[in-house]
């Protein structure tokens, strides 16, 4: 059985968001750094710091929460893993789905790197659909 790092970071972020934690610590790899850069650029997280313990690198994410009068915290986003090691899902640039009419984003792994659905449509490249975020 292999380790699915993308599912691990999605689960860590989702669990921290549901438990109203302010920060999440995830392992740093090239894939996780690319996904976190997209989340930061799209405004789903507030801040990212790189932390080094012994020989391992970690990313510390500061999540974005919204205060509400009725509820103390409201979760901002939902994450869903689409393509997984047992069942890969691919799409070309014309068939990439729009999440909530363009409000959400799709993160793809293409031949030109990891990017959002909007960037993939502009560059006219398809790839493996990693996750949906809305």
Curated annotation (Swiss-Prot):
<dbReference type="InterPro" id="IPR000630">
    <property type="entry name" value="Ribosomal_uS8"/>
</dbReference>
<dbReference type="GO" id="GO:0009507">
    <property type="term" value="C:chloroplast"/>
</dbReference>
<keyword id="KW-0699">rRNA-binding</keyword>
<keyword id="KW-0934">Plastid</keyword>
<protein>
    <recommendedName>
        <fullName>Small ribosomal subunit protein uS8c</fullName>
    </recommendedName>
</protein>
<dbReference type="GO" id="GO:1990904">
    <property type="term" value="C:ribonucleoprotein complex"/>
</dbReference>
<dbReference type="GO" id="GO:0006412">
    <property type="term" value="P:translation"/>
</dbReference>
<comment type="subunit">
    <text>Part of the 30S ribosomal subunit.</text>
</comment>
<keyword id="KW-0689">Ribosomal protein</keyword>
<dbReference type="InterPro" id="IPR035987">
    <property type="entry name" value="Ribosomal_uS8_sf"/>
</dbReference>
<comment type="similarity">
    <text>Belongs to the universal ribosomal protein uS8 family.</text>
</comment>
<keyword id="KW-0150">Chloroplast</keyword>
<dbReference type="Pfam" id="PF00410">
    <property type="entry name" value="Ribosomal_S8"/>
</dbReference>
<keyword id="KW-0687">Ribonucleoprotein</keyword>
<dbReference type="InterPro" id="IPR047863">
    <property type="entry name" value="Ribosomal_uS8_CS"/>
</dbReference>
<dbReference type="GO" id="GO:0005840">
    <property type="term" value="C:ribosome"/>
</dbReference>
<dbReference type="GO" id="GO:0019843">
    <property type="term" value="F:rRNA binding"/>
</dbReference>
<keyword id="KW-0694">RNA-binding</keyword>
<dbReference type="GO" id="GO:0003735">
    <property type="term" value="F:structural constituent of ribosome"/>
</dbReference>
<comment type="function">
    <text>One of the primary rRNA binding proteins, it binds directly to 16S rRNA central domain where it helps coordinate assembly of the platform of the 30S subunit.</text>
</comment>
């Amino acid at each position: 059985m292999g380790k699915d790092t993308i599912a691990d970071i999605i689960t860590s972020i989702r669990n921290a968001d549901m438990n109203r934690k302010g920060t999440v610590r995830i392992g740093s790899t090239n894939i996780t750094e690319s996904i976190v850069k997209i989340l930061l650029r799209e405004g789903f997280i507030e801040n990212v710091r790189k932390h080094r313990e012994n020989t391992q690198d970690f990313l510390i994410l500061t999540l974005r929460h919204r205060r509400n009068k009725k509820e103390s915290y409201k979760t901002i986003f939902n994450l869903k893993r689409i393509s997984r090691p047992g069942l890969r899902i691919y799409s070309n640039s014309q068939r990439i789905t729009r999440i909530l009419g363009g409000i959400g984003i799709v993160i793809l792994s293409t031949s030109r790197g990891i990017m959002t659905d909007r960037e993939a449509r502009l560059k006219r490249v398809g790839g493996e659909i990693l996750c949906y975020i809305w």
